[in-house]
Amino acid sequence: MEKLVALSGVVKSYGDTSVLMGIDLDIAKGELIVLLGPSGSGKTTLLNLIAGIDTANSGEILVLGKNLSEMTDLELTEYRRDSVGYIFQFYNLLPNLTVMENASLGLELKGEELDYAKIILEKVGLEDKSQRFPAQLSGGEQQRVAIARAMAKTPALIVADEPTGNLDKNNSQSVRNLFKEISNDATIIIATHDNDYLEIADKAYELNEGKLIKIK
């Protein structure tokens, strides 16, 4: 399988606090990867490094064959904008925009892009609620809009940080199922403390005291 992400000897610390110590990780195109660990274990830090939001102290991070540490500021901005889709625990939907408008931020809602936006909403099961506003949706439905938004520019990589942390059991299961369904369209990395994600993972790792341990 084609390698999309490759980390080698990645170290990250904040002041005297070591967070990640010598992380090695290869992710193939189309894989769904789950990073498990309690709060403070470094899951979010690792996501941010891969997404180009933060920088490592040492080591190498290659995404799409490019070394993130060698990118210019402009190249990093373009990488974050065009190649990475983000999903967070809090949906961050704009309350005055409809489901369609939130899901398609950055697209022009006409012609082929309008057709594509409709396809995305169909994928996440919200095609019949495209003109509703966030306040009219359940928490699970709002997170589905956030997932659709992350897919809108067909990113190579989707990173999700505790995407079901605020949802009840039924909505959490629904969102996990959706991640599995869309994993054919993008490489997905999910950071979570929820062991139920092991069911959908192609590979899973646990962060423990700065080290990455493969558990699936």
Go through the PLM ranges and name each one.
Residues 59-67:
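Conserved ABC transporter NBD signature motif
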Residues 132-135, 153, 184:
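Conserved signature/switch motifs of ABC ATPase nucleotide-binding domains
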